[in-house]
Amino acid sequence: MSINIERALERLWARAAVSVPEWLPMRYIEWLPIVYDIALEFRSIDKGRSNIYLVLLDYQDRDGAYGVYVGMSKYSPAQRFDQHKAGIRAAGSVLKRGIEVLTGPTLHLQYIKRSEASRIEEELALALASAGLRVMGGH
């Protein structure tokens, strides 16, 4: 019976996956609304080629919690995540513990000036850490 349920769930997911927006995280994280609120406090006026991105980090083996990596790149968040996972200029925390890109909170922080992105990356990491999250990156 459990095999039938698993197959039904696989079919359901295959149909539903097409309509799930890429910015929606694939798991529930209780602190994610806090991340959205904090990220919305940051703005950039000038357009450019840099993107701010967040990566969900898995610390389940340590204390059962999740963390977040804050980064900046000229590549799209998805491309940069793939580079991290492939070991290309990879942050160790993302290479080892990165699960997925949390695109939603930083959608408004895409294509901004490099100088602004650098400042926002650092300040966003500090703000998230001040809110009690485990934060890596942000430098």
Question: What are the language-model segments listed below?
Answer:
Residues 139:
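Active-site or metal-binding loop neighborhoods of secreted/extracellular toxin and effector enzymes
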Residues 119-135:
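C-terminal structural segments of small proteins and small subunits
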Residues 42-44, 70, 96, 101, ...:
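Generic structural signal for short, flexible, solvent-exposed coil/loop and linker residues
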